[in-house]
């Protein structure tokens, strides 16, 4: 993976700071979990591995949902919204990001929050809807349970929902019955790229 990243960077002739996203928990550039990638990444400093491949170029590695949340809060659906903004990405699992007045609370992993005896993503990921053949109405009830569990813990000011299914937000967001406003992501597939660039140039957690 590091060699592929280096090849892309070199192709564009980029020598400035680089932001890289990863589908799991990352602390100080070190990979802590590996749900959808090889377990050998756990405990490895992805930041150092990639930087070494790039001859010492500055590299920042962060969770992919965190990157998307940063971008949506600053430039997308959460633009000009103060307080606590929570991004949830619905796909194979559920990714999450929490932004408070522009600052990231990293690695929240709400997809693994227990809701009614099940992990949130086992209850309400869009893959569950597809696998079980649920209607949007039935699936929205499960999403509502996840949102309410998060609301009970932290009282957010806005939920932003992303992932491929957010493109059909008009079919299910109006069916949600939680108290906090819910809006679809605006930047879609570019959110992670924009957020990675933000993290590469600024300390987004302080």
Where in this protein do the model-derived segments appear?
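ATP-binding/phosphotransfer module of carbohydrate and carboxylate kinases, centering on a glycine-rich
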Residues: 1-18, 26-30, 50-59, 71-90, ...
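Conserved NAD(P)H cofactor-binding loop of Rossmann-fold oxidoreductase domains
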Residues: 23
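A charged helix-plus-loop insertion that forms the helical arch/lid used to bind
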Residues: 31-44
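Internal amphipathic helical hairpin motif
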Residues: 45-49
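Gly/Ser/Thr-enriched, mixed-charge loops and adjacent short helices
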Residues: 67-69
């Amino acid at each position: 993976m590091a060699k592929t990243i280096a090849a892309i960077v070199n192709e564009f002739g980029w020598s400035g700071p680089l932001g890289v996203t990863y589908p799991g928990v990352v602390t100080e550039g070190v990979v802590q979990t590996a749900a959808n990638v090889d377990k050998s990444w756990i405990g490895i400093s992805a930041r150092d591995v990639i930087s070494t491949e790039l001859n010492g170029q500055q590299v920042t590695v962060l969770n992919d949902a965190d990157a998307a949340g940063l971008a949506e809060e600053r430039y997308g659906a959460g633009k000009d919204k103060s307080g606590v903004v929570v991004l949830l990405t619905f796909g194979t699992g559920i990714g999450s990001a929490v932004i408070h007045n522009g600052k990231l609370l990293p690695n929240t992993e709400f997809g693994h929050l227990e809701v009614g005896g099940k992990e949130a993503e086992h209850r309400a990921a869009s893959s569950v809807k597809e696998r079980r053949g649920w209607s949007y109405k039935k699936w929205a009830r499960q999403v509502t349970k996840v949102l309410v569990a998060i609301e009970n813990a932290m009282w957010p000011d806005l939920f932003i929902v992303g992932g491929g299914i957010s493109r059909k937000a008009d079919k299910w967001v109006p069916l949600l019955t939680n108290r906090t406003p819910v809006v679809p992501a605006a930047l879609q597939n570019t959110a992670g790229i924009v957020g990675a660039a933000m993290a590469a140039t600024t300390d987004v957690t302080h």
